[in-house]
Amino acid sequence: FVELISRSGLFAWISVKILKVSGGDPFKLLICFSGLTVVFSAFLNNVTAMIIVGSLTIVACKKLKLSAMPFLLAEGIYTNIGGLLTLISSIPNIIVGTAAGIKYTDFLIVAGPYCLIAFVATLYLVRYLFKIKPLSNEVEKAKAKVMVDAFDEWETVEDRTFFYLSALVLCAIILGFALHSSIPVLNQMGLEVIAIIGATVMLVIYPTDVEGVLNEVEWTLVLFFLGLFTLLGVMEHAGVLTMIGELLKTPLSAGETIGPIAMMWSSAFFSGLTDNIPLAAVLAKVLEGFQSNIAELDWFADYGHMLWWSLIFGAGLGGNFTPIGSASTVVAIGILKKEGHNVTFMQYVKIGAIVVLVQLTLATGYLFGAEKVGLIKKMNTEKASTEEVQGHGSNGH
């Protein structure tokens, strides 16, 4: 479905429109591209979002004679904020959200406000770290506007009928996701069924190269999941997950404040050192084990819901810690290298560590505040239907 939308030129069209809104001002450009990155990474594969926005960023920076490094590194950071926005925005969200029984709308209600807070805080943090300054006078603003107006948003749109159809179907799909649990007919479908229906409608009304689209499917990711969940099953039967659970029981049961903090910060740390998908899968299995024995674990009954959310936030945000903790950051650094900008491991860590520290501090305060005002509620012990999220493993680090 996403590949069909991409081929229509819709995403590139949106990108250029937003670029023109900035007027060529570096800080406004940072705001626009960061916002675009969050939106794209919320609905697309994080790597795809980084490639789309990153390629446009390179062109824009060349035209405006700006260094692309701060913009691309910022976009790599923002993909992880966008990946936290909805239940299907990233693979860890899907894995943990399914195990915890979190609905699409409930996830958005909890994660949405934090993403907005993190967006603004990270924006000014990145502006400070990279010393991005707005245009200072009217002459500079007028010159930049002339450059930006030279962009043609319709350049990548080969067929306007296909373009408008894609926009209509995309809006319908997003609306279907949001209203999934509220409308009985949609509630009987998995989210993947809604996406498949959208793609089918586009193929029927506007036939295209089906074989070419299928070639773009991330089959290696599908095989990765087959292997991952097979391995998790073996680990579960061999008692490895039980052993991990026993090791984690002490810090996680240390209290309704210490437990969630320990989960969030430790998962964020390890997420920055390794891929967050297997990390989220293993820890979700461990929490599932605690949940299945909730009658015997009073502490999990009291604040288990906070442990689930702490894992979601920790695994999602920790990837900003190192350049290898997030696939989108790897892509951003790769694009920069092609353009002659080399970013070393330690150069990135000096920035990433500060960003993660600020984002996790905000997330910690936010989660406890959200629970206090009733945004985060105690969860049912039963799992969410796996049908709700199967097939949407398109986003990871």
Where do the protein language model's features map onto the residues?
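Membrane-interface alpha-helices at helix entry/exit sites of multi-pass transporters
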Residues: 24-32, 62-74, 102-112, 294-307, ...
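Hydrophobic transmembrane alpha-helices of multi-pass small-molecule transporters
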Residues: 2-7, 112-246, 343, 347-397
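Short, amphipathic, aromatic/basic-enriched membrane-interface segments that mark the entry/exit
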Residues: 17-26, 154-164, 297-301, 347
